[in-house]
UniProtKB/Swiss-Prot annotation:
Keywords: Acetylation, Acyltransferase, Endoplasmic reticulum, Fatty acid metabolism, Lipid metabolism, Membrane, Mitochondrion, Mitochondrion inner membrane, Mitochondrion outer membrane, Transferase, Transit peptide. Its main location: mitochondrion. Its EC number is 2.3.1.155, 2.3.1.16. Residues 1-34 form a transit peptide. The modification N6-acetyllysine is found at residues 73, 189, 294, 299, 333, 349, 362. The record marks 429 as: Increases nucleophilicity of active site Cys. GO terms for molecular function: acetyl-CoA C-acetyltransferase activity; acetyl-CoA C-acyltransferase activity; acetyl-CoA C-myristoyltransferase activity; lncRNA binding; protein-containing complex binding. This is Trifunctional enzyme subunit beta, mitochondrial. PANTHER family: ACETYL-COA C-ACYLTRANSFERASE, TRIFUNCTIONAL ENZYME SUBUNIT BETA, MITOCHONDRIAL. Mitochondrial trifunctional enzyme catalyzes the last three of the four reactions of the mitochondrial beta-oxidation pathway. The mitochondrial beta-oxidation pathway is the major energy-producing process in tissues and is performed through four consecutive reactions breaking down fatty acids into acetyl-CoA. Among the enzymes involved in this pathway, the trifunctional enzyme exhibits specificity for long-chain fatty acids. Pfam families: Thiolase_C, Thiolase_N. It comes from Rattus norvegicus.
Length: 475
C-alpha cells in the first residue's frame, strides 16, 4: 500500500492502479441542500443481550463549539469542561452525589490541570468523593471516555457515570527548548554561586527558541493534512468533490441550526463576556469562493484547503450514562441505548484516516446488523477528502479483499442518512469532545425521525478508529 500511495502522489497527473479503481464512480455531494426523507419505521429486533445490563444515554450536552481564538480564548480547558458538566446538571437535575464516576477525554494536556476531569468535576460542584480520570486517544478521546463508562457499568462497578471531553486550541502549551529546560533544572540543583555561574557560561541564544506542540504524527513525521491530501489523491477524490462535500456539511449545519435541531447545545456565560449560545464556525459559502483557496498542505497541487478541512476548535461535551434499571428507578426517560462498539488500528502512514472503513463492518458483524439496518450515520469529518476516500474504500470489493481480508465490501453510507445536521467540517472539532457530539446527534436524530439504529464512526491520529451502534430508546 505504501508504494501505491507514494507513487500516486509523486505524480498527480498520472492515475495509479489503485486510483483507477476508485475513479469509476464519482460520489455526488450536491451543493443543493435537500431535506432527508423520513426514516421508514421498520419492525426490528432489539440488540439487548440476555444476562447483560442495558446501558443507556440519559442526556448529553455540549457548550457551543467555537473557532479557536474567539470567545473562549482567555479560559482554561477545565473552565470549558466545567461549563459542560454544569449544563448537564441543569439539563438532567441529577443529584451530584449520585454520580459514581466521571471520565473526560482530551488531547492537548494543560500542565496545570493534568487530570482535567477531576478539576472540572470539583469546579462544577460534584462531590469530592466522586473519582474522576482523564483519557486520551486523539480524536476519539471522548469515545474512549464513553466506552470506559460502559465498561464500568457493565461490570457492576458503577451505575451512574458522566463521560465527556474537552479541548482548548486557543492556548496550547508552548515549552522552552530541551536545552533550556535542562539548564533550568541544573541551575535549580546547583548549590553554590560558582556552580551556577559555570552553568550559565554554557547558555546559547538558541536555547530561547520555543518548542511548539507537534502537529505531525510522531511515528511518520507527516501532518494529518498531508495524509489527507495523499489519501484523496490515491482514491481519486477531486478538489471539486471535496469542496462540494464541505459545502454540503456547512449548508446542512446551518439548516439544522436554524431549525433548532442542535438541541444538545447549552448556553455558556463566558466570564467577562456575553453568553454564547451557538456554534460560530458554520459558514455556508459557494463553490466559486471555495475554489479560490490555495492548497493548505501540499503545494501547489494538493486538494486539501482550509475550506474542506475541519478547523481548530474550542469546546466541551458531557453525557450522563446509566444502567437502564437505575435510570428508570430515578424517573428518567433515556434517549438511547449504547450497544456494540469496536476500536481498530492500522498503518498510520497510508491508512491514517481509514478508521471508519475498518471499524464499520466489524461493529455491524458484532451487532448482527447490515448497512441496510442503519437509519442514521454520524461520522467524524476531519477532511472532506477523508470522508469521500472512506466512502470509496467501503464501496469497493477490491479494497475489501486486498487490504481488509474480507470477501465483500460493506458498502458506503447513503448520503440521505449521513451527517444530515452537519459534521465536524462545519460544527467544529474540539479533538477531545467530538465523540460525545456524534453520539448525541445520532440519538437525537433517531428520536426525531423514528429510526432504530445509528452507526457512529471516527478516525483518529495514530491510524486508529472507532465505531459504535446506538439504538433508539422506545418512545
Amino acid at each position: 500500500m505504501t508504494t501505491i500511495l507514494t507513487s500516486t502522489f509523486r505524480n498527480l497527473s498520472t492515475t495509479s492502479k489503485w486510483a483507477l479503481r476508485f475513479s469509476v464512480r464519482p460520489l455526488s455531494c450536491s451543493s443543493q441542500v435537500q431535506s432527508a426523507p423520513a426514516v421508514q419505521t421498520k419492525s426490528k429486533k432489539t440488540l439487548a443481550k440476555p444476562n447483560l445490563k442495558n446501558i443507556v444515554v440519559v442526556e448529553g450536552v455540549r457548550i457551543p463549539f467555537l473557532l479557536s481564538g474567539t470567545s473562549y480564548k482567555d479560559l482554561m480547558p477545565h473552565d470549558l469542561a466545567r461549563a459542560a458538566l454544569s449544563g448537564l446538571l441543569y439539563r438532567t437535575n441529577i443529584p451530584k452525589d449520585v454520580v459514581d464516576y466521571i471520565i473526560f477525554g482530551t488531547v492537548i494536556q494543560e500542565v496545570k490541570t493534568s487530570n482535567v476531569a477531576r478539576e472540572a468535576a470539583l469546579g462544577a460542584g460534584f462531590s469530592d468523593k466522586t473519582p474522576a480520570h482523564t483519557v486520551t486517544m486523539a480524536c476519539i478521546s471522548s469515545n474512549q471516555a464513553m466506552t470506559t463508562a460502559v465498561g464500568l457499568i457493565a461490570s457492576g462497578q458503577c451505575d451512574v457515570v458522566v463521560a465527556g471531553g474537552v479541548e482548548l486550541m486557543s492556548d496550547v502549551p508552548i515549552r522552552h527548548s530541551r536545552n533550556m529546560r535542562k539548564m533550568m533544572l541544573d541551575l535549580n540543583k546547583a548549590k553554590t554561586l560558582a556552580q551556577r555561574l559555570s552553568l550559565l557560561t554554557k547558555f546559547r541564544l538558541n536555547f530561547l527558541s520555543p518548542e511548539l506542540p507537534a502537529v505531525a504524527e510522531f511515528s511518520t513525521n507527516e501532518t494529518m493534512g498531508h495524509s489527507a491530501d495523499r489519501l484523496a489523491a490515491a482514491f481519486a477524490v477531486s478538489r471539486m468533490e471535496q469542496d462540494k462535500y464541505a459545502l454540503r456539511s456547512h449548508s446542512l449545519a446551518k439548516k439544522a441550526q436554524d431549525e433548532g435541531h442542535l438541541s444538545d447545545i447549552v448556553p455558556f456565560k463566558v466570564p467577562g463576556k456575553d453568553t454564547v449560545s451557538k456554534d460560530n464556525g458554520i459558514r455556508p459559502s459557494s463553490l466559486e469562493q471555495m475554489a479560490k483557496l490555495k492548497p493548505a498542505f501540499i503545494k501547489p497541487y494538493g486538494t486539501v484547503t482550509a475550506a474542506n478541512s475541519s478547523f481548530l476548535t474550542d469546546g466541551a461535551s458531557a453525557m450522563l450514562i446509566m444502567s437502564e434499571d437505575r435510570a428508570l428507578a430515578m424517573g428518567y426517560k433515556p434517549k438511547a441505548y449504547l450497544r456494540d462498539f469496536i476500536y481498530v488500528s492500522q498503518d498510520p502512514k497510508d491508512q491514517l484516516l481509514l478508521g471508519p472503513t475498518y471499524a464499520t463492518p466489524k461493529v455491524l458483524e458484532k451487532a448482527g446488523l447490515t448497512m441496510n439496518d442503519i437509519d442514521a450515520f454520524e461520522f467524524h469529518e476531519a477532511f472532506s477528502g477523508q470522508i469521500l476516500a472512506n466512502f470509496k474504500a467501503m464501496d469497493s470489493d477490491w479494497f475489501a479483499q486486498n487490504y481488509m481480508g474480507r470477501k465483500t465490501k460493506v458498502g458506503a453510507p447513503p448520503l440521505e442518512k449521513f451527517n444530515i445536521w452537519g459534521g465536524s467540517l462545519s460544527l467544529g472539532h474540539p479533538f477531545g469532545a467530538t465523540g460525545c457530539r456524534l453520539v448525541m446527534a445520532a440519538a437525537n436524530r433517531l428520536r426525531k425521525d423514528g429510526g432504530q439504529y445509528a452507526l457512529v464512526a471516527a478516525c483518529a491520529a495514530g491510524g486508529q478508529g472507532h465505531a459504535m451502534i446506538v439504538e433508539a430508546y422506545p418512545k
